[in-house]
Each structure stands twice: as structure tokens, then as C-alpha cells.
């Protein structure tokens, strides 16, 4: 009988830990989603500086697109400003199909799709974002966009 009681207590404890883990994952996903929502809102206002607030402000930030690798927050900002130098080029940004993988309480990966609605075209693609929780909040430390 003692073994059954101990087994039952162990199962309840394990279920409690799993529930807390799922709750934590949901919380982290929501916090990261907020960063991405803020980014798309800034982009859609024509505010590239505001969009970049979601990125780690470090020379170690890595942005990969096609065959190009850009390192550093400022070079990444400069790249965006050069490539999207008008509201027409910026269009309306939408993120979709988001899949969150929580690696630790301070690290996560997001796989998703992006699209720009513009007058003359509608470019779109996929991305993988690596997020880390910093003192300022969740920030993208690596962005691989295609």
C-alpha cells in the first residue's frame, strides 16, 4: 500500500511540474509574441528604429539573409534603412505561422513566415529567430530570414 501511495504522490508531483512548465512556456511565448507585435507595429508606422528595438543592441547580433551575413546592431539597422528607404518599399508587415521552441527560461527559437503587402508586389518568406531574455526583456540575437 505504501508503494501505491508513494507512486501516486510521485505522479501528482510530476504532473504539477509539467503543468508549471507548460505555464512558463505559454508565458515566454506570449512575451516574445509581444516583442514581435511591437516590431510589426513599428514597421507598419514606417519606424525602422522602433522595429530594431526588438533586436539585441550588440556588435554580436547576427542577421542572415540569402548569402549575406550582417553582424552588429548598427550594421543591421543600416541594412534595413538602405533596403527599405521609403514607405512604399516597407509595405505592411505581417508575421504568421509562428512556432515557439522554448530552450530555457532565457532562450527561445521562433520559426515563422513573414509577408509584406505592397502596391506592386507581395514579397514573403520564412524566418528563424533566436531570442534571449536580457535585462531589457526578450531580444533577437540571431535572425535568419529567407
Q: Model features per residue range: what roles?
A:
Residues 95-97, 111, 140:
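Hydrophobic residues on conserved beta-strands that form the core of alpha/beta folds
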Residues 106-110:
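Short, hydrophobic/aromatic-rich segments at coil-to-beta transitions
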Residues 124-146:
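Short beta-strand edge/turn micro-motifs at domain boundaries
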Residues 2-9:
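Sec-dependent N-terminal signal peptides
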Residues 48-103, 115-122:
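A solvent-exposed, acidic/Ser-Thr-rich amphipathic alpha-helical stretch
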Residues 4, 16-54, 75:
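Short, low-complexity N-terminal intrinsically disordered segments enriched in polar/charged residues
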Residues 111-115, 130-132:
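Residue-level recognition of well-ordered beta-strand positions that form the cores
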